[in-house]
Design a protein with these regions (language model features):
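Catalytic-site signature of metal-activated, phosphate-bearing donor transferases
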Residues: 1-159, 166-172
Length: 172
């Protein structure tokens, strides 16, 4: 798809997204949160740029992003231990970013965010069709949502106590 795009000359769109297919527990996911996971990976640096987000940086473009055929294959981690450790790091960074923006985590958000995430990706987006790998992928994602807001709540509590400087969120 990329060669065909450039065979016609300079591509017209400022950026192109590809469907990322995630490999998890030895299986290429075809549903749920694992596919299609659209990501911009081809872009004109004059008309698009990476965000400075601490987690899940993405490309923002001046104009509409076009889609390319084909899959971008992505192995998210070597092992389940690595994947869970990565989620722990990401949720710490996400909680810190939300905390810096002044956001707070209510009990309702801690409880409902993981539930709605699980239902959205396992039921609505048919993650159940990916079997045990799909269940594990969505369940870990839902737990990561819980961790993010629980860590944010921990930061909120420390903010009230005036103790947020240098907090290691991987220990919360």
């Amino acid at each position: 798809a990329i060669r065909a795009l450039f065979a016609r000359g300079m591509p017209p769109a400022p950026a192109y997204a590809m469907a990322r297919r995630n490999r998890f527990l030895g299986r290429w996911l075809a549903h749920g949160e694992g596919y299609p996971d659209w990501n911009v990976r081809l872009f004109d640096r004059r008309r698009a740029r990476w965000t400075e987000d601490v987690v899940h940086e993405h490309v923002v473009a001046e104009g509409p992003v076009a889609r390319l055929d084909g899959d971008l294959l992505h192995a998210s981690a070597e092992s389940i231990e690595d994947y869970v450790a990565k989620q722990n790091r990401y949720t710490s960074l996400q909680a810190q970013a939300l905390h810096a923006k002044g956001e707070r985590a209510s009990f309702a958000r801690m409880a409902l965010s993981p539930l709605t995430r699980f239902l959205r990706f396992y039921v609505v987006k048919a993650g159940f069709l990916d079997g045990a790998a799909g269940f594990a992928h969505v369940a870990i994602g839902a737990f990561a949502s819980f961790l993010k807001y629980t860590k944010l709540r921990g930061l909120d509590a420390r903010r009230l106590e005036g103790q947020t400087a240098g907090v290691d969120l991987t220990r919360l």
